[in-house]
A protein has these predicted regions:
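Extracellular loop-to-transmembrane helix junctions
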Residues: 53-102, 107-113, 126-154, 178, ...
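Helix-loop-helix junctions that connect adjacent transmembrane segments
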Residues: 177, 181-239, 268, 291, ...
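Extracellular/periplasmic helix-exit of transmembrane alpha-helices
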Residues: 191-201, 261-313
Length: 686
């Protein structure tokens, strides 16, 4: 059964990957951009929708601000990434988690780790939900199955990612470059039409938009709040920075320079695409609202009619070409690039979780060296959590966006603060004037990045707090506490298991027990029991006895009869259990044996069946496993499981285990009966 499960797991996750092979992985910029920067570029597929959705609250007139909001997002992104490029050298050397932990302390580091992991989870949930939205735009009959489509995409993607980074690297660049080619041609053609006045109207341009706040004027405080909310919604276009900065190891040499260029290229492409899409959406009259049945109507005389909204990108493409062919191809390419964006998260999440687990803030099974496929545990964990978020929010991109960006801005802010602090300390001990000038320049640039990132974070949290940002903050705080608890647990384990430095204490820890008592659990006198007896006798303990529990008088009589018939030279002890609780009876017997001689060790030998098929497990009682689990918590007690493989016994029927015959002068074995009375689950000797 184990071999079959191993084959199934290997078929799913692929064969083992040599750590040296993974370390030697190097990506040129043309492959690194699709594999590591797709989550930022693909965000234009839904960032434009979010900007329009927020502005539409104030009516159609507010949509004129959408290109300017996109331009503000692009400028802020260029400033943040332009300053963040100066941090790549420090981040590449040890990773952002280790950098923040060393410069700012333990608690800021776990906050950063939790923020990054949440950002990866939401990248998958948002990208797959957006992909499902494009699929339902192509096939309106699937509108009611959006959540199911998103979950299916996540599951399939998880299986693909379990096959390894190399397979993804060979496939990732095609969808992104096809998407960029189709979208680039569409936007250039659309801009030419807009400048010449030949751009057609979008599908939703003829709809009647009812503002949610009809009495609000587009000036003063309301306008500032509206633009801030739309900026926060579109700030998802800034995602992807941490993935590239933490993946410098995968770039070709010079690694840091190539990573910095890829980072800048990603934000430039994203900014140009976002501004162009929003401009064409405004020129073609694209309208999107959160509740279309209430605030959007195709016929004013019949309100509250169902309207199937299509993404802004799809509507713009349809307005540019006026037919279904190229918009359909662009929608399919968008779905593909959103899938690649999730692949980026599936690369970053396991690496980030592995780096955190290496420092004992997450379970060690998430460490890369502990997994057959190096990152399989992290991939599975990300897939499960992403599915939970997608199902919880019904694959609603607008609802998921409210949780987004908080983690990204938090992690970037902490990293930049750590770098500034590192350079300030370095400046104090630097004497060479040229080196001091260079450090001062770097500190100034990084400080600008800190201020801008902090302003973005405050804006996002302030405008999205009640809409969902509070949930992100709560998740980050809870996960941070879990990380600290995990670290304290591992520290406690290290303290309890560390060998004392004092020689006398170390000698006491390594001292041999006074005596070793072997107890062989016997349920029936069959070959597995005889093998356990043979193993126990071969260990030459100080004393040895067999132990059986009287749950059935007829079975006990059979055990005694066969014991005497085989002349087994081991004393058979019988304990009564009127309430047929085998585990409690054996546990009580072992405890009393330990109590008599606290410095002695008791070794309990447990014969156990090993079956070939999973369904055969159901046919056998799990008494031995329950005994083993209960005895593990007893001090001074060790368990030795003696397996008996049934399938091996079938293939080699001639092998038997015969007891050693006692000498003729040896006294026949005796039976000792310990009567135990069990009252309401408690055991006690009578």
């Amino acid at each position: 059964m184990n071999n079959r499960w191993g084959r199934m797991r290997r078929a799913l996750t692929g064969g083992p990957v040599d750590s040296r092979q993974l370390a030697a992985t190097s990506l040129p910029k043309r492959y690194a951009l699709p594999l590591l920067g797709s989550d930022g570029i693909s965000s234009v597929a839904y960032a434009a929708d979010e900007v329009i959705l927020i502005l539409a609250v104030a009516g159609a007139g507010a949509l004129t601000y959408s290109p300017w909001v996109g331009f503000a997002i692009a400028v802020v992104g260029l400033v943040i990434v332009g300053t963040y490029r100066y941090n790549i050298r420090q981040v590449a050397a040890e990773g952002d988690f280790a950098l923040v932990r060393r410069k700012l302390g333990r608690r800021p580091a776990v906050v950063l780790g939790a923020s990054v992991l949440l950002d990866y989870v939401l990248t998958v949930a948002v990208s797959m939900s957006s992909a499902a939205t494009f699929i339902t735009a192509l096939f309106p009959q699937l509108q009611g199955f959006r959540a199911g489509i998103a979950v299916t995409l996540i599951v399939v993607l998880s299986v693909v990612c379990l096959r390894g980074v190399q397979l993804m690297g060979r496939l990732a660049h095609w969808p992104l470059y096809i998407f960029l080619a189709l979208l680039g041609i569409t936007l250039v053609y659309g801009l030419l039409q807009a400048f010449t006045g030949t751009l057609a109207r979008a599908e939703s341009a003829g709809y009647t938009l009812t503002p949610e706040t009809p009495h609000a004027s587009l000036d003063g405080v309301f306008l500032v709040l509206l633009l801030s909310r739309s900026f926060s919604a579109g700030a998802v276009a800034l995602s992807g920075v941490s993935t590239i900065s933490n993946s410098v190891r995968f770039f070709k040499a010079p690694k840091q320079r190539n990573a910095a260029l890829t980072l800048m290229l990603m934000i430039v492409i994203t900014g140009v695409l976002l501004v162009s899409i929003l401009y064409l959406a405004r020129q073609s009259g694209v309208q999107l609202v959160q509740n279309p049945s209430r605030y959007l109507s195709a016929d004013p005389s019949s309100p509250n009619q169902p309207i199937h909204q299509k993404p802004a990108l799809y509507q713009v493409a349809f307005a540019v070409y006026g037919n279904d062919l190229i918009p359909t191809l662009l929608a399919l390419a968008t779905v593909a690039v959103l899938v690649i964006a999730s692949l980026t998260a599936f690369i970053g999440f396991p690496m980030g979780a592995s780096a955190i687990a290496d420092r004992h803030y997450l379970p060690h099974r998430l460490r890369s060296v502990d997994s057959t496929g190096l990152y399989s545990n992290g991939v599975i964990l990300l897939g499960v959590i992403s599915v939970l978020f997608t199902v919880l929010f019904a694959a609603d991109v607008f609802a998921l966006i409210q949780l987004y960006v908080v983690g990204m801005c938090t992690s970037m802010l902490l990293t930049q603060v750590a770098v500034v602090r590192f350079r300030l300390r370095k400046l104090r001990i630097t004497l060479k004037p040229s080196a001091r000038r260079k450090l001062a320049r770097d500190i100034t640039v990084s400080a600008v990045g800190v201020v801008v990132t902090a302003l973005v974070l405050v804006t996002v949290v302030g405008t999205k707090f009640l809409a969902g940002a509070w949930l992100s903050l709560t998740f980050i705080l809870l996960l941070s506490e879990v990380m600290l608890m995990t670290r304290r647990h591992y520290a406690r384990v290290d303290k309890l298991t560390e060998i004392p430095l004092d020689q006398e204490a170390a000698a006491d820890a390594a001292a041999l027990p006074s005596r070793v008592h072997a107890v062989v659990y016997i349920e029936r006198v069959r070959q597995p029991a005889l093998r356990a007896l043979a193993y126990a006798r071969a260990a030459r303990p100080s004393t040895i006895e067999a132990l059986t529990v009287n749950n059935d008088r007829q079975l006990l009589a059979t055990v005694k009869e066969r014991w005497d018939m085989l002349h087994i030279p081991v004393q058979l002890s019988v304990i009564d259990s009127p309430y047929r609780d085998t585990v409690s009876s054996v546990l009580d017997y072992v405890r009393r044996k330990r109590k008599k001689s606290p410095r002695d060790v008791v070794v309990v030998y447990l014969p156990e069946f090993v079956v070939a098929h999973w369904w055969q497990e159901i046919l056998h009682r799990r008494t031995v496993r329950r005994l083993k689990k209960a005895l593990l918590h007893e001090p001074g007690v060790a368990t030795a499981t003696v397996p008996w493989a049934l399938h091996a016994a079938e293939t080699q029927p001639g092998e038997t285990v015969a007891p050693t015959q006692p000498p003729s002068s040896e006294e026949p074995p005796t039976h000792r009966v310990h009567r135990l009375a069990l009252y309401r689950g408690k055991t006690g000797a009578t």
